[in-house]
C-alpha cells in the first residue's frame, strides 16, 4: 500500500437506521491523496468521515465528494446506510461540475 496509514476510530452516535453488522468497529479504507485506514461503526455520516480525512490532508471538505464503487454518497447518509462494510475502500475526490447535493 502506498502512503501513510492512519487509524481513526469514529465515535459518533448519529440518528437514523444503521447497519447492525457494523456496530462493532471495523476497518474501512479511504483513498484521497494518500490511503487512510479508518475504524468505523457505520453510524458515522459521510460528511463526518469526509471532514476527518480532509483535516488529515489539509483539504477543504466542501470541495470534495466521497465515492463508493464510483457512485457519489450523500453527505447526510451514514456509512452503514451507504453499504460500507469491513474492508470497503472509499474515494475522496474533487467535486465535478454538475454534481450537486452530495
Curated annotation (Swiss-Prot):
UniProt-listed Pfam families: ubiquitin
Record-annotated Ubiquitin-like domain positions: 23-99
Protein name per its UniProtKB record: Putative ubiquitin-like protein FUBI-like protein ENSP00000310146
